[in-house]
Amino acid sequence: MKKIRNFAIIAHIDHGKSTLSDRFIQLCGALSSREMVNQVLDSMDIERERGITIKAQSVRLNYKALDSQLYQLNLIDTPGHVDFSYEVSRSLAACEGALLVVDASQGVEAQTLANCYTAIEMNLTVVPVINKIDLASADPNRVLQEIEDIIGIDATDIVFCSAKTGLGISNIIERIVRDIPPPKGDPTAPLQALIIDSWFDNYFGLVSLVRIQNGTLRKGDKVTVMSTGQSYNVERLGFFTPKKIDQEELKCGEVGWLVCSIKNIFGVLVGDTFTLTYQPAQQALPGFKKVKPQVYAGFFPVNANDYQSLNDALGKLRLNDASLFYEIEQSNALGFGFRCGFLGLLHMEIIQERLEREYNLNLITTAPTVIYEVITHDKNTYFIDSPSKLPSIHEIKELREPIAKCTILVPHKYLGKVINLCIEKRGVQKDIFYHGKMVTLTYEIPMAEVVIDFFDRLKSISRGYASLDYEFQFFQTSNVVRVDVLINGDRIDALTIITHRVNALYRGRELVDRLQELIPRQQFDIAIQTAIGNNIIARSTVKQLRKNVLAKCYGGDVSRKKKLLQKQKQGKKRMKLIGKIELPQEAFMSILNVKKKSNKVC
C-alpha cells in the first residue's frame, strides 16, 4: 500500500487534462506508440470532438521513480463541466491527492475553483500545475499569483509543464510520488468498495469502476450493494492500463473494475458502496446521493414511425447514464415522444447529438424547462417538469421555482456588465470578493434563468473571460405564470412556457412575432395568440396566400366576379376548419431566443 498513489486531475474544460493523461500513459509505457491516440481516456467520439470528458475513466500506471522504487499510480480522469460535478466529487472521494491543472494563458476559472474547494474539503493533497507554458499568450507568473490569491493555496513549489510537447511531465510524476500520501485503509477489515462509475457492456453486462477503501475483493466473492441490499457474485475483476486486464483480486487502496452480471444500471449507482455479503461492513462510505435531473425537455421523432427506435435508443443510453431520466409524453401537436431529464444543458445537447448521430434519428426538441413546486388550494404538493402539466391558475395556491447558487469568476473590467446581467436575470447578490484583477461574485439566480441563455450571454459580455459554476439550493415562492400559445384557437402544448409575470407580456409579444416569421403562409389566415389563463395577451396573423380567381374574367358581368370571389371565400373558410399547419423545428427553438425584459423583479 505504501507504493500506491491514487490521484485525480482537476481542470476546467480545455485546460489540457486529457492531453496530460496521454503524456502520463506514454511516459509510463502503458501503451505502445502504435496504440496511442489523442485523448486516450475519452472513449466516445463526441468527447474527442468537443474536447470534453463526460464519463469518469481510470488507468493504472507503473512508474520507476528517481529513488529506484516501483510505484503504482492510479489516475482517475474526471469530467470538467459543471453538469457532471457529482461524478467529479465521487472520483475525488477515491483519491488521496489531486493535480490542479491551470491553463497558463486563461488562468483560474470558476469550475476549477469549485472542484478544488471540493478536494480541499475532502482533505486531499493538491499539487498545482501550470500547463500550456509553450503558448505565445502564456503568462505563468500572473497565473501563479491567481492560484495563490483566488484559490488560496501555496504555489511556491508549483510545476510548469506543456502536455502538448511533453515538457515537465516527469517532474509532475515525481511530485505525485513525493507529495501525495499513500492510501489509508485496513486490509483485514470488512470490505468497503466505493463505486466511482458504472457503464454497460454488451457482453459482460454492467461494469463497475471501484476503489477498495477497506478489505480485499476476490474473484468469486458474493457482494452486496449497501443502499439497496441486492447481492451479486463477482465473476471477473481487474484494472485498466487503459486496456482491460483481468486479475484474481483487488487489494486495499487499489482501483479497478468488476463484473457481476448485473443487467440494470440502477442496481449499482455512482457513489454507492459494495461490501461482502457474508462479512458486511457496519456502514456505507459517506457522500452517496441519488442524482436528480435539473433540466427537462421533450424529444419527439419527426417521423412517427421512429417512435419505437427512439424508445430503444434512450433505453441503451440510459444503461450507461443513470442520470438520464425519460418517460412517455403525448403532445397534441407533436404526437408521441419522451419527456427527458438532464443534469444541465450540455448534458441535454450531448444526449440529443448521440441520438441523432449514433441512432440516425431526426428529432424535434422542445425548449428546456426546470422543475417547479406547486401547492394547490387542497394542500397537495406537485413537482411539475413540463409547462403543459401546470394546473389551472385558479387551482394554484403557491408556485415555487428552483433557485441556483451561482459562483462567477470575472476580470474586474467586465464586472459592471456581469452585475447588470445578473440583475436582469432576477439575481440576488450574496457575496463579492476581489483578488487582484479578478472578482468572485456569488448570486442566487432562478434556475430557469440560468439554463436558458445565461452562460452564453455571460461569455459574450465578458469576451469569454468569465466562468460560471452553479448548483441547486432551494425552492422559493415566485410570481410565475404559464403562457400558452394558440394557433387558430388550438393550444399548442409543446410551445407553452413558464415565465415571471412581469416578463409575461413582453415574452408573449416576442414569441408571437417570432412565430409569425417562422410559420409558412398557407391558403388561409393563421391566427397566432399567446394567453395567460383565458386572457389573450398578444396576437398576430400570418396572412393567407391569395389566388387571383378573376384572372380569367375579361370584363363582363360584375355578378360573375362576385360569385367567384364568394366561392373562394367559402372554400377558404372550409379549409381553415380542416387545414393542418406544419410547424418547423425552428418554431420550438424560438422560445429559447426570446430575450427577456431587462428589469429587476423583486
Swiss-Prot record:
Catalysis: reaction(s): GTP + H2O = GDP + phosphate + H(+)
Gene Ontology molecular function terms on file: GTP binding; GTPase activity; guanosine tetraphosphate binding; ribosome binding; translation elongation factor activity
Gene Ontology biological process terms, A to Z: positive regulation of translation
Keyword Membrane: yes
Listed Gene3D superfamilies: 3.30.70.240, Elongation factor 4, C-terminal domain (3.30.70.2570), Elongation Factor G (Translational Gtpase), domain 3 (3.30.70.870), P-loop containing nucleotide triphosphate hydrolases (3.40.50.300), Translation factors (2.40.30.10)
Family membership: Belongs to the TRAFAC class translation factor GTPase superfamily. Classic translation factor GTPase family. LepA subfamily.
UniProt cross-references to PANTHER family, sorted A to Z: TRANSLATION FACTOR GUF1 HOMOLOG, CHLOROPLASTIC (PTHR43512:SF4), TRANSLATION FACTOR GUF1-RELATED (PTHR43512)
Function: Required for accurate and efficient protein synthesis under certain stress conditions. May act as a fidelity factor of the translation reaction, by catalyzing a one-codon backward translocation of tRNAs on improperly translocated ribosomes. Back-translocation proceeds from a post-translocation (POST) complex to a pre-translocation (PRE) complex, thus giving elongation factor G a second chance to translocate the tRNAs correctly. Binds to ribosomes in a GTP-dependent manner.
Protein name, entry field: Elongation factor 4
Phylogenetic placement of the source organism: Bacteria, Pseudomonadati, Pseudomonadota, Gammaproteobacteria, Candidatus Palibaumannia
